[in-house]
Curated annotation (Swiss-Prot):
Disulfide bonds: none
UniProt xrefs under NCBIfam families: IF-2, small_GTP
Superkingdom field: Bacteria
Name of this chain's protein: Translation initiation factor IF-2
Biased composition (Basic residues): 553-567
Organism: Synechococcus sp. (strain CC9902)
Region of interest (G4), ranges: 781-784
Region annotation G1: where it falls in the sequence: 677-684
Region annotation (G3) ranges: 727-730
Function: One of the essential components for the initiation of protein synthesis. Protects formylmethionyl-tRNA from spontaneous hydrolysis and promotes its binding to the 30S ribosomal subunits. Also involved in the hydrolysis of GTP during the formation of the 70S ribosomal complex.
Compositionally biased intervals (Basic and acidic residues): 478-492
Region ranges (G5): 817-819
Region (G2): 702-706
Length: 1176
């Protein structure tokens, strides 16, 4: 014993008088970790080994005699086993050969002894009565290996057991284990009744039968046949009269001939354990502890022999001590030993097709044979006996299982043994009966259907089907064997035999099968797999359904995360390639696109755009926002034209003002005419001529900067007709205004100056009119000026698909002179003719709907909006909602400043009473009450906030084309502005113009932009942020001027947009650092070199300009510059001078340069600072 209180294996072997390997075998069966004779084990583990080896010795002897009858057969195959232990019991001689296998069986027996410790199914236990009495202890069943058929059944089920026997226990005669049986009083019974030898739990063990192993069934088939021989001896005592006659008749033939296993030969080489006897030891894992309550849902085994001593207590279904294994009934047709009256597990239904053993009175047959659980290794049941009669039991009392050849069995191949180790628990629900299985339990004994021929078991990965047993045998359980709940139950009830479970090698060769057992721990998975592999193939009918789930699992399992990523990448690539078609044109919304959005629009990879920008000197990311020039440059590289969305989208009519309910009340309404064209082409002058007013003369700078709405009444065919004119700005900054004017118009008048022709804003106006789908009437203005050519204008317009009527087109073109009033009447007549064709109608009897043309904040009136009513009638006091702004009309005035009480369709009015300045371009609608209007406004307000936030983010974006090195280094300067204008349209125009200013080194940030006067709050904000306040056509509120003076805030007021933009650009340039530039002074030529001490002086002649002392010089020698630095001394006739002019000679010296040579050219210059300009 070691100092820590542990015992070494070699010390224990000395105490027991055994060899080291015998003790190691016993430790292995008990799942005790012991690698060599010097390994240490605890006292409790040593006690277990002592009890196992001590008890096993005695039983083996009695078992040997029992085995005597069978020795002949087993001896041949099991000669390997040593007969040493067999002699222990008299009469064992003949069985000795068989005993060798039993030696392995003995280990098996030991495992049963440990069932509590290890879930070792008691292999065939020889002890009948004794076992029975001792059956209460699981250990005894372990000894059961000696027992014949019953024992076999028990041992067979344990696949793990089979693995355990990997190393033969020949050194230890089975006699050792058998002694355990002998120890039990039932030992004598064993001879008389080999089957009873199985411990009561052993009876449960028979459930092992479920495992389809032909060889294994007889006696721990997985175990070497040696164990069987032992069983054979008990078989010798034919005393098993209880068995049905059919069983008796069939018994001998099976012993002589292996059961017909259609799919594979009776001995399954794969299933044969490496060591014959050991398998039985492993089987004990399956052994259920005596007295253990049957597992819920498991039907009692039919025909399983029960210990005589335990009849009172229903034999509990063997619990899966180790790996769960389906229990099998005692061998089919194997009669119960006489005298074993232990009833079958109580409550367990008789297994259909399994004959009840005569010896078991009152044992209910198990109706749900399908629900059998694999307690140990499943054993193949063959319906046919040697005699060919299926269901014929082996010799009465023969321990061998029905259908198994008598005598010693050939050891199962290690590979198959591993497979057998997979435990399978079956759900209580009956599985579908196999076609070959008899429907009734009684049929089993009488008429047995011949077993269905099955193909040979496939390779390890394939789940072998179940081989049918004798007619009386259990039917093959179906998929229910793999029920998760049953497995989990088995895991809970099984004894700690985890080390033993490690034996499964299945994982080495079969990954696919390992995948099938998902949801179980590694060891349990391997066990389950091994059990499934041990089964023979199913009949074809069932095979179709069985593989399906496996295939599905495999399919899912095959795809790894990397494979899935590759597949998705390929799908995305294919999708991109499919839509790799370049668009004919892209429309850029609101001059704002990210790299990724542009890539999607161009149907190219974002990396291509990033690469293109990189070669242009711009570092970009996929989320970088691009400005319009950059978008156009990138799109041009890919040959895709770009169109700004606001050019067309803003001009589209999105809301239909006429509803279905208005159709019965429509009347003719006046047309709305929008006057558009390039700046200074005479739009407002033309309107003045039509209105006979002088509006243009009163406009700042002579240009229109907001929309004007006017109504003109003219005579046409002796009838007064009204026309509503909208005058739009022509400056490039007022694109949004022009778009809004076109959106509400019925006819567009395109004004083109005859002396200027088609200009950029002319083209934009054309695109607006086309987007709004309104007819165009061209007014060729200024025909009275010199150099005017109407035909040239028509030619240029024809290039824009506007062909004059006189040239065969459909566009009305009228030459006019706004100053002289020429052809004005003709133009109006053409407008009325065009609008008559349009059939313009509206319903004046409904609440008004229309569009906000312009809006501003008046310091006296508050928010004021110019509304164009497109349908219905607007009255004073109406509650209306204009976008997210709520208003109640307090007053209305027309273009002549006359107050109105109501205004009909196509009328333009200025309305007062809004809660805030509405947004120009929003539609308005009158609601019956304020509550309904507020509900609508609430929803719109939340949307407006989100839109505003997006716009603010967009205004802060950095243009890629404007990004410079200084900006990357954090030296980008910012000019903060606060913008206040008279109307909303002017604010939009100025913001749009500021976006076009170059931002290489100075970024413009608009902190606040709104219509209205400049307030003290604006001044405070400007003072806090260092901003400049820009006012456009607005004034300052009281107190604002004083606050601005006090805080030193710069407030600028403008009335012409040109001047405003010019000053802002100058302010941006003022933030730039001045740059140093060279200013040339003159040149001189070296004609002589004088050495003075260590330095040298050059005698020079000034050719051009002047030389200044301390100026910068470059010395050129040929094509090279040999020196650049300061000119330190300048002398003339030995006098220091400040400068030498052209045509004079002088001496030049530089402290850092003395290598003068004749012919050198001296270039004199100085560095001066210069104000920097913004570069576009």
């Amino acid at each position: 014993m070691t100092s820590s209180g542990k015992v070494r294996i070699y010390e224990l072997s000395k105490d027991l008088g055994l060899e080291n390997k015998d003790v190691l075998d016993a430790a292995e069966k008990l799942s005790i970790a012991a690698k060599s004779h010097s390994s240490s084990i605890s006292d409790s583990e040593a006690g277990k080994i002592r009890s196992l080896l001590g008890k096993g010795a005695s039983p083996s002897q009695p078992t040997a005699p029992a085995a005597k009858p069978a020795p002949a057969k087993p001896a041949a195959g099991k000669s390997i086993l040593s007969v040493k232990k067999a002699p222990a019991s008299p009469g064992v001689t003949a069985p000795v050969a068989a005993a060798k296998p039993q030696a392995p069986a003995q280990p098996a027996a030991s495992k049963p002894l440990q069932p509590s410790v290890k879930a070792v199914a008691p292999p065939a236990r020889p002890a009948p009565a004794g076992s029975t009495s001792a059956g209460s202890t699981p250990n005894k069943p372990a000894t059961a290996p000696a027992r014949p058929t019953a024992a076999t059944t028990t041992s067979t089920p344990r696949p793990a057991a089979a693995a355990a026997p990997s190393r033969p226990a020949p050194s230890k005669p089975q006699g050792a284990p058998k002694p355990q049986v002998v120890g039990k009083p039932s030992a004598p019974e064993l001879v008389s009744k080999p089957t009873p030898a199985t411990k009561p739990t052993g009876a449960a063990k028979p459930a092992i039968v479920s495992k389809p192993i032909t060889a294994a069934k007889p006696a721990v088939v997985a175990k070497p046949a040696a164990a069987k021989p032992t069983i054979v001896k008990p078989t010798a005592p034919t005393p098993r009269p209880a068995s049905s006659p059919a069983a008796a008749s069939s018994a001998p033939p099976p012993a002589s001939t292996p059961r017909p296993a259609p799919s594979r030969p009776t001995p399954r080489p794969a299933a044969a354990p490496s060591r014959p006897g050991a398998p039985q030891g492993q089987k004990p894992q399956i052994v259920s502890r005596a007295g253990a309550p049957p597992r819920p849902g498991t039907p009692p085994r039919v025909g399983a022999p029960t210990k005589t001593g335990t009849p009172a207590r229903p034999t509990p279904r063997p619990e899966l001590v180790g790996k769960p294994v389906p229990r099998r009934t005692g061998g089919v047709g194997a009669p119960q030993r006489p005298g074993t009256g232990v009833p079958q597990r109580q409550g367990g239904p008789a297994r259909p097709g399994a004959p009840t053993r005569t010896g078991k009175p009152g044992a209910p047959t198990r109706p749900g044979g399908n629900t059998l659980e694999l307690v140990g290794k499943p054993i193949r049941r063959d319906g046919s006996s040697a005699s060919g009669r299926p269901g014929a039991p082996t010799r009465p009392g023969a321990p061998t299982r029905p259908g198994m050849p008598g005598g010693m069995r050939k050891p199962v191949a290690p590979g198959e043994l591993m497979q057998l180790q997979k435990p399978i628990s079956r759900p209580a629900a009956p599985a579908p009966r196999r076609p070959d299985a008899p429907n009734r339990p009684t049929e089993a004994a009488g008429t047995a259907t011949p077993p269905v021929a099955r193909p040979t078991a496939p390779s390890a990965p394939r789940r072998p089907g179940f081989r049918p047993g004798a007619p009386g045998g259990q039917r093959r359980p179906g998929r229910p064997d793999w029920d998760d709940s049953a497995k989990l139950e088995a895991l809970r009830s099984r004894s700690p035999q985890k080390q033993r479970q490690k034996v499964h090698i299945i994982g080495e060769n079969d990954d696919a099968l390992a995948a099938q057992t998902g949801g179980f721990a590694g060891e349990q998975q391997a066990m389950v797999l091994s059990a499934s592999l041990a089964r023979p193939a199913k009949p074809k009918a069932q095979q179709r359904t069985a593989p399906k789930p496996v295939a599905a699992v495999r399919k899912r399992r095959k795809e790894t995360a990397r494979q899935r990523q590759r597949r998705r990448a390929m799908e995305l690539r294919a999708a991109r390639e499919a839509k790799q078609v370049r668009p004919e044109m892209i429309v850029v919304p609101e001059d704002n696109l990210t790299v990724q959005e542009l890539a999607d629009m161009l149907s190219i990879e974002s990396s291509e755009i990033i690469k293109s920008l990189f070669f242009k000197g711009v570092i970009a990311t996929v989320t970088q926002t691009l400005d319009m020039p950059t978008i156009e440059a990138v799109a041009k590289e890919f040959d895709v034209p770009v169109l700004q969305d606001d050019v067309e989208e803003a001009a589209k009519k999105t809301v239909e003002m006429i509803e279905e309910a208005d159709l019965k009340h429509l009347i003719r309404r006046p047309p709305v005419v929008t006057v558009m064209g390039h700046v200074d082409h005479g739009k407002t002058s033309l309107l003045d001529a039509i209105r006979q007013a002088r509006v243009a003369a009163g406009e700042a700078g002579g240009i229109t900067q907001h929309i004007g709405a006017y109504q003109v009444e003219i005579q046409h065919k002796d009838e007064a007709r009204k026309l509503t004119f909208l005058d739009t700005p022509g400056h490039a900054a007022f694109t949004a205004m022009r778009a809004r004017g076109t959106k509400v118009t019925d006819v567009a008048v395109l004004v083109v100056a005859a002396d200027d022709g088609v200009r950029p804003q002319t083209l934009e106006a054309i695109s607006h009119a086309r987007a709004a789908e309104v007819p165009i009437v061209v007014a060729i203005n200024k025909i009275d000026k010199e150099g005017a050519s109407a035909d040239r204008v028509k030619q240029e317009l024809s290039e824009q698909n506007l062909l004059a009527e006189e040239w065969g087109g459909d566009v009305v073109m009228v030459p006019v002179s706004a100053i002289k009033g020429e052809n004005i009447d003709k133009l109006l007549e053409m407008l009325l003719l065009v609008t008559e064709v349009e059939d313009l109608q509206a319903n004046p009897d409904r609440p008004a709907r229309g569009t906000v043309i312009e809006a501003h904040l008046d310091k006296a009136k508050g928010p004021v909006a110019t509304l164009l009513i497109q349908n219905g009638t607007l009255k004073t006091g109406d509650v209306l909602a204009a976008g997210p702004v709520l208003g109640k009309v307090r007053a209305m005035v027309d273009d002549n400043r006359q107050r109105l009480k109501e205004a009909g369709p196509s009328f333009a009015v200025e309305a007062l009473g809004f809660s805030e300045v509405p947004t120009a371009g929003d539609e308005f609608e009158v609601y019956p009450d304020e509550k309904a209007a507020r509900a609508v406004v609430g929803d719109r307000a939340s949307n407006a906030r989100a839109t505003r936030l997006a716009q603010q983010m967009a205004s802060r974006r950095v243009s890629l084309t404007a990004m410079s090195g200084q900006a990357n280094e954090g030296e980008l300067k910012e000019l903060n502005l606060i913008l206040k204008a008279d109307v909303q349209g002017s604010v939009e125009a100025i913001l749009g113009s500021l976006e076009q200013l170059p931002k290489d080194e100075v970024q413009v940030r608009v902190l606040l932009s709104a219509p209205g006067e400049i307030t003290e709050t604006d001044v405070d904000l400007a003072a806090a942020s260092g901003a400049v306040i820009i006012g456009f056509n607005t004034s300052m509120a009281s107190g604002a001027k004083k606050a601005a003076d006090a805080t030193g805030v710069d407030v600028r007021d403008y009335d012409v947009i040109y001047k405003l933009l010019e000053d802002i650009q100058l302010a941006m340039e003022g933030l730039l650092e001045p740059e140093l530039i060279e200013e040339a002074l003159g040149e001189a030529e070296v004609r002589a070199v004088f050495t003075i001490g260590k330095s040298a002086v050059a005698g020079c002649y000034v050719n051009t300009g002047k030389l200044h002392r301390n100026c910068r010089v470059r010395v050129h020698r040929g094509k090279q510059v040999v020196y650049t630095g300061d000119l330190d001394s300048l002398r003339r006739n030995k006098d220091d001078v400040k400068e030498v002019a052209t045509g004079f000679e002088c001496g030049v010296g530089a402290d850092r340069f003395a290598n003068w040579e004749e012919g050198d050219r001296i270039e004199a210059f100085k560095m001066v600072t210069q104000r920097r300009k913004l570069t576009t």
